[in-house]
Amino acid sequence: MEKTMLNAIKSGFGIAIAAMLVAAPAAAADFEVHMLNKGKDGAMVFEPASLKVAPGDTVTFIPTDKGHNVETIKGMIPDGAEAFKSKINENYKVTFTAPGVYGVKCTPHYGMGMVGVVQVGDAPANLEAVKGAKNPKKAQERLDAALAALGN
């Protein structure tokens, strides 16, 4: 009788573990964006310049070359999302939870077009606001290209 009860407990425990594994959410992904003096798209760039992630994913912005930071661009983040700004020359990790499009810039090199786009999720509700934001000419050209690369 003890073996039957023990087997029942083991079997119930196994079922509980299996149920928890099935119910567990997929692990969030980690991405890297490098801040470079020179990249495939020219001088002062984020590589990649556009990135699509899922809510809960993390992006680490890495100043591969010195003198860079990352900061959200005013008017280019989803409602409810928090703006962020890193220090110069420091890696900066962001976990994106609010779906939408985030425009980012390197503060010292914004006028030179050092910008990028992170899209969180598939249907960015703030896309029109992002497209309507005013930016320096070179920055706007690169933002338009980054949005186009994401299919927007």
Swiss-Prot record:
Signal peptide: 1-28
Cofactor note as given: Binds 1 copper ion per subunit.
All copies of domain Plastocyanin-like, residue ranges: 33-121
Record keyword Transport present: yes
Gene Ontology molecular function: copper ion binding; electron transfer activity
Gene3D superfamilies for this protein: Cupredoxins - blue copper proteins
Binding site for Cu cation: H68, C106, H109, M114
PROSITE patterns: COPPER_BLUE (PS00196)
Subcellular location: Periplasm
Cellular compartments per GO CC: periplasmic space
Main location: periplasm
Cofactor(s) listed: Cu cation
Annotated keywords: Copper, Electron transport, Metal-binding, Periplasm, Signal, Transport
NCBIfam families registered for this protein in UniProt: pseudoazurin
Role this protein plays: This soluble electron transfer copper protein is required for the inactivation of copper-containing nitrite reductase in the presence of oxygen.
Name assigned to this protein: Pseudoazurin
Source organism: Achromobacter cycloclastes
Lineage of origin: Bacteria, Pseudomonadati, Pseudomonadota, Betaproteobacteria, Burkholderiales
Annotated gene: bcp
